[in-house]
């Protein structure tokens, strides 16, 4: 079975390995890195069935990328950035080919409840911007959807992978909610080797603060 992961940041890569090591260690996993500065150099996994490839950091949601993905005949596609028209274009068309589309938590985006003024107007403006971006790339979705601030609401998303399923303010209809596997020693060793840091952290008499880079 083949799986595709679309990643942009170190956090995405870390979470991808959490999913792979727990659920898909015996499958063929293709990690596509769309990052200009965040993830540099060669990314090579210790698992022989994990393959990394590069994409442009923007404007990769085009027909040629879609065809490349189709050749892989994936069972699942995982992506993190819900506000990316590139990801939405690719996910929509792969879902039409019966590929399972999984949106994976990126930060705390799944959990807020939005009470913005003129919420509908903002949704319409962002929907227009989405379609404008796609048309500029000659990338077409032959249906109209209205962008929503409700996380993962788009109907062609099949699964939501989140750290805290019980904290979701709502569950979109017909979505399967899956907890992201916990970080384990195998994943720590894997990412420490990839990013070249020591897997152990001194904890005596220090305060460890971890924030988003």
Functional labels for PLM-detected ranges:
Residues 125-208:
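A nucleotide-sugar donor-handling region in carbohydrate enzymes
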């Amino acid at each position: 079975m083949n799986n595709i992961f679309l990643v942009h940041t170190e956090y995405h890569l870390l979470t991808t390995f959490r999913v792979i090591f727990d659920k898909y260690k015996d499958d063929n996993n293709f990690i596509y890195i769309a990052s200009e500065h965040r993830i540099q150099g060669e990314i090579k996994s210790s698992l022989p069935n994990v393959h990394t490839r590069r994409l442009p950091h923007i404007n990769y949601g085009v027909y040629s990328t879609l065809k490349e993905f189709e050749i892989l005949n994936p069972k699942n596609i995982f992506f993190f950035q819900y506000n990316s028209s590139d990801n939405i274009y690719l996910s929509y068309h792969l879902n039409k080919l019966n590929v399972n589309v999984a949106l994976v938590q990126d930060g705390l985006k799944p959990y807020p409840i939005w009470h913005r003024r003129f919420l509908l107007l903002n949704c319409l403006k962002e929907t227009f911007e989405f379609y404008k971006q796609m048309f500029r790339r000659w990338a077409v979705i032959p249906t109209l959807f209205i962008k929503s601030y409700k996380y993962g609401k788009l109907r062609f998303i099949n699964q939501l992978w989140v750290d805290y399923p019980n904290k979701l303010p709502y569950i979109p209809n017909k979505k399967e909610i899956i907890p992201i596997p916990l970080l384990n020693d195998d994943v720590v060793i894997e990412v420490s080797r990839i990013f070249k840091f020591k897997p152990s952290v001194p904890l005596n008499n220090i305060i460890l603060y971890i924030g988003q880079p």
